[in-house]
Amino acid sequence: MRKRQQSQNEGTSAVSQAPGNQRPNNTCCFCWCCCCSCSCLTVRNEDRGDNAGRPTHTTKMESIQVIEECQNPTADEILSWAQNFDKMMKTPAGRNLFREFLRTEYSEENLLFWLACEDLKKEQNKKVIEEKARLIYEDYISILSPKEVSLDSRVREVINRNLLDPSPHMYEDAQLQIYTLMHRDSFPRFLNSQIYKSLVESITGSTSET
């Protein structure tokens, strides 16, 4: 009986000594646009996807490709994106903003695939090339992937042949096809989106005030 009471008292003591409602002190910045690389943007976008009722799928390559670090773009740079898709895609800030828009259209995988191909082109180690080529296939080419990109049969045949001997440029045809799709299909809607218009209004407004 004494042992039972003793164990109960110890349990009560342990509970009383446990920390209360302590929360980690996670500070977060308030970004002026999506070009910031802080974690608050990632969480906000994930919540937006959950609220939309669409299940989110994290691919193996996407875990590497978080929001790219970059400096805030100048007003001239932001305005120039409307005239030149290539120029926007060459800047991390432009890609980050475009990626946020694609996420609202559930086509973020197109940009992620393009970025993964760019990353593969930089590799020289054969083992790393083989591993990254395999991950790209599993994440974006395989029909079993929830983030499969839209490619025609000819390009798929080329990819299947290239898998026998992976190289840094094995996805070049597929990358060009997806790049063209984003340019012709997604980019015009991006320029008319609230995401881009709000950013333009914010920088033009601040410029006129100064």
Swiss-Prot record:
Region annotation Disordered: where it falls in the sequence: 1-21
The keyword Acetylation is annotated on this UniProt entry: no
SUPFAM superfamilies: Regulator of G-protein signaling, RGS (SSF48097)
Transmembrane segments: none
InterPro entries cross-referenced by the UniProt entry: RGS, RGS_sf, RGS_subdomain_2
Keyword Membrane in record: yes
GO CC terms, sorted: cytoplasm; membrane; neuron projection; nucleus; synapse
Occurrences of domain RGS (ranges): 84-200
Pfam families: RGS
One biological process term in Gene Ontology: negative regulation of signal transduction
Post-translational modification, as annotated: N- and O-glycosylated in synapsomal membranes.
Annotated compartments: Membrane; Synapse, Synaptosome; Nucleus; Cytoplasm
Principal subcellular localisation of the protein: membrane
Subunit comment: Interacts with GNAI1 and GNAQ. Interacts with GNAZ and GNAI2. Forms a complex with mu-opioid receptors and G(alpha)z/i2 subunits, including GNAZ and GNAI2; the formation of this complex results in mu-opioid receptor desensitization.
Protein name as it appears in the record: Regulator of G-protein signaling 17
Organism from which the protein derives: Gallus gallus (Chicken)
